[in-house]
Regions:
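Flexible mid-to-C-terminal extensions adjoining Fe-S/redox cofactors in radical SAM and related proteins
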Residues: 235-285
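Short coil/loop residues immediately preceding or within conserved phosphate-binding loops
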Residues: 6, 226-227
Length: 285
């Protein structure tokens, strides 16, 4: 991978599912032609990642993926479950890796797309030869289940899990669900244990940076929000991170030829997660 900074274009706020923990905190969607113009403007200077609330609410967006050489897609899986012919469209546009949400232990509590349907969708993706990563959010109700979560996914034939920390953003306003620092450390210990248990080539145990720096086991976390990583919303507002899409965190507004590196004055401790510290741990929230 080159050393160019990253731009994530959030294509849409639309979703076909209801999740009580949804972090999306913006509205609107891009026209495909406008995204093409934005990609052509930025791709020489930045690596570009395409994301959204649920990209498959507008399958035309898939035509954009070859333009940025992106082979992975994040989804809740519902559109694929309801319309399996999307499998062919994914392949036609170069998608080889699919990350799908499955919040083991709490899924049917937090998502209207039932866990049994998610499992059927995962089976379809695996049988269609996609590399499947399961995205699992951890809160107070399931953070102690990490060993069970890993064992279940291994038995299912999944090769990778990505654990995400509950961040108090968007619909995530239940502060009683937030993991405190001791619970985060407990989760990190369990993740480390699972990495010791499984060969990474057989089952890769990963986690997002939203747990913060792991001082117990060492890690290479470097939060690049607003310095080497930026997010453009459908309304063209520029944010440092997908979890920091609200007014007090805006960096500016996208315009053709905009140099985010020179216009950003966003400063923070690179060795901690800015969203975690300011949305979960900040006592002013």
């Amino acid at each position: 991978m080159n050393n160019k900074p990253w731009i994530t274009i959030m294509l849409t706020s639309k979703c076909n599912n209801y999740c009580s923990h949804c972090y999306i905190n913006y509205d609107g969607e891009w026209d495909v032609s406008e995204v093409v113009e934005c990609i052509n403007d930025l791709k020489g200077t930045y690596n570009i990642n395409l994301d959204g609330a649920e990209i498959l609410t507008k399958p035309e967006y898939l035509s954009l993926f070859p333009l940025v050489d992106q082979h992975h897609l994040m989804t809740n899986g519902k559109a694929i479950y309801e319309n399996p012919s999307l499998i062919d469209l994914l392949k036609q546009n170069g998608i080889t890796d699919v990350s799908i949400s499955y919040h083991y232990g709490i899924h049917d509590e937090v998502s209207s797309f039932r866990s049994s349907c998610v499992e059927q969708t995962i089976e379809l993706l695996l049988s269609s030869n996609f590399n499947v990563t399961v995205m699992t959010m951890l809160n107070k109700k399931n953070f102690l289940l990490i060993p069970d979560i890993c064992d279940f996914f291994v038995s299912f034939g999944i090769k990778k899990v990505m654990f995400a920390n509950y961040i108090c953003q968007g619909k995530n306003k239940d502060r009683n669900s937030i993991l405190d620092k001791n619970e985060v450390n407990c989760a990190l210990n369990s993740i480390h244990s699972m990495r010791q248990k499984y060969e990474s080539s057989d089952f890769y145990v990963s986690r997002t940076g939203a747990f913060g720096f792991d001082s117990m086991h060492g890690c290479n976390l470097c939060c690049d929000a607003g310095t080497e990583g930026f997010v453009i919303l459908p309304n063209r507002k520029v944010c440092p991170c997908v979890f920091l899409c609200e007014n007090n965190f805006f960096i500016g507004e996208y315009a053709k030829g905009c140099d985010f590196l020179s216009c950003s004055t966003f400063a923070h401790d690179f060795y901690s997660c800015f969203a975690l510290e300011n949305l979960n741990y900040c006592t002013d929230k």
